[in-house]
Amino acid sequence: MNRIEKGSLLVLAIIVAFNIFFGLGSIPLLDPDEPVYAETAREMIQFNDYLSPRIYNEYWFDKPPMYYWLVAGAMHVFGDGEFAARFPAALMAFSTVIMLYCSITRLFNERAGFWSALVLATSVQFFYLGKAAVTDTTLLFFLTGSLLCYLHKQYWLMYVCMALATVTKGPIGIVFPGAIIFLHILCTGQWQKLFKMHCLRGLLLYFFIAAPW
């Protein structure tokens, strides 16, 4: 990474960090989703049970546990409050922007990387979800990571990202990127990629990570 790229990355990181983290815990958790995710994580800590999510002492499995785990970890560090409940979503939003910049810069050039990342960072929906205690930016991070890993031919890491996306929000974690990758191969005729991707062993790795929960 040259000086221009480092400078652009620093400017981008400052803009995104201010945009996402400023005032993160300044307003109460908003219905319907934020209080549910925060309370589920709090009860994981209370009952010392990180495998079976519950709310108001009732087991529930509406969502996989990834975001609850992240919020529980943040609560151990920052305490039980709005900031801790939203911090994982904000961190994942920040990380997605930085990952996108680094990846697009490597694939194309610094200008493309900077503007791609800046457009994402300043999108209204992205701004809202990055400051809310919901699963969406965590899912976005892993889905984006899986597709970027595919473009960079980092196939083992691609399967890991798909598995973690599944542990975040269910089968969409593999169905969504899998469909995009298949359509790309179909449209480009690059069928040899299927052999390079080690699909069978990759799926075994995917299930090794995603299936236990």
Residue ranges and their predicted role:
Residues 1-213:
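Membrane-integral, polyisoprenol-dependent glycosyltransferases
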